[in-house]
Amino acid sequence: MAQHGVFGEIVSAEGAYIHNLLPFWDAYWKNPDGSDPEKLGWRMKYNKENRGDVYATHGLGPVAQALDIHRGDRFKTLVAMDTKSVVGRNYVKQHTGKDCPEYRNGDQTTTLMRTENGKMVQIQHNVMTYQPYNRLYKLIGTSGYATKYPEPRFALDGGAIKESGVPQVDKLDTHNFMSKEQQDALVSKYEHPILKKYGAIAKEVGGHGGMDYIMDARMIYCLQNGLPLDMDVYDLAEWCCLAELGTLSMDNNCAAVSFPDFTRGFWNVEKGFKHAYAAPEDEAHAAAAAKASTEAQKQLTLKKKLWEKYDKEKAKAAKKAAKK
C-alpha cells in the first residue's frame, strides 16, 4: 500500500519491540564459562550491562523499508531517552538475593530519528513491564494512516479511498477508521505477492504465526534465483547501530547524535524500496533444480547412512567434552 501511494507521502512512522519477558528470563542460555556468575541468563545480563534499544530490528526494519531508507532517504539525526530501571533491578534482586545498584537499561527506551527528507521515526523497546505484545507499526501519511496493533486498522481521506477503488459504504471523516467491508476490500486489492505465494502454507507450518517460514522461504527464493536479498548490508548497519547511537545520546543527557551515512553518499542513487522477482520461466527452472538437488541429497544420505556418521561424531565430541 505504501509503495502504491495509498497513504500519500509517509511523513512519520513508528515501530517497537514491546514484549514482557518475565515468564522467559530464566529460560535463556546461562554461559557456563564463569562470565555469568549470577546465572541471570545471557539476555537479562545483556540488558543489565547495556543501555539503549538492544533489540531494534523488529520495530525499525519494516518502517525503514516503508520510508525508502538509503533508497532515496537516510536517517540523519537521533535522540534517545529511557526510564529508570525498576523491573530489571527488582528481577536481579529477587534472583540473586542482593541489591542491584547498577542496571544500565531502562524499563522503556524511546528513540526518535529524523531523516534527510524531514521525516520522523519513533522506535520503542520495552521487555520489562506488563503490557500486551506490540510492535506498533504505524504509518502516518498525507492521505492516510495504518496501524498493525492491537489489530490492523486503516484510515484514509475521501480522495485516497476513491483512488484505491474501495467502496464508499458510509461517510468517513478523519476521526474514524475504515469499516470492515472497506478494509477487507483494501487488503484484498493490495495483498502482497509474497503473502499470496507463501501465506497459506506459512500459517499451516507456523513459527511465530508463519513469519519464520515466510522469511526463510523468501531468502531461499532470492538465493535460488540469483536475486538481491530484501535486506542488504547497509540495512544491517543502519538498523543495528540504533543501540550504540542511543547509548551515546542517553549517556550525554539525551543529546542529538548524528547518524552515520554507511552508504558514503550513495543513499539517494536507488529510488524506492522494491522486492526482486524472477521471471516465471526462470522461477520454475530454479524450483525444479532445487527439488532435484534435494532429492539427490536424500538419496546420498540413505546410501551412505550419513546419520550414523553424524551420531558417531556427536558421541566423540560428547566424550571429549566430558573428559575436560
Describe the residue ranges of each PLM region.
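Predominantly a Rossmann-like dinucleotide-binding segment in NAD(P)-dependent oxidoreductases
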Residues: M1-Y103, N253
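A structural signal for well-ordered alpha-helical scaffolds and beta->alpha junctions
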Residues: I10, A56-L60, G106, D212-D216, ...
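C-terminal helical cap and adjacent loop that interface with cofactors, partners, or active-site loops
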Residues: A64, P132-I140, Y145-P150, G158-K324
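Beta-strand scaffold of nucleotide-dependent catalytic cores
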Residues: D73, Q122-H125, K148-Y149
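Active-site beta-strand termini and strand-to-loop segments that position acidic
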Residues: T111-N117, L139-G141
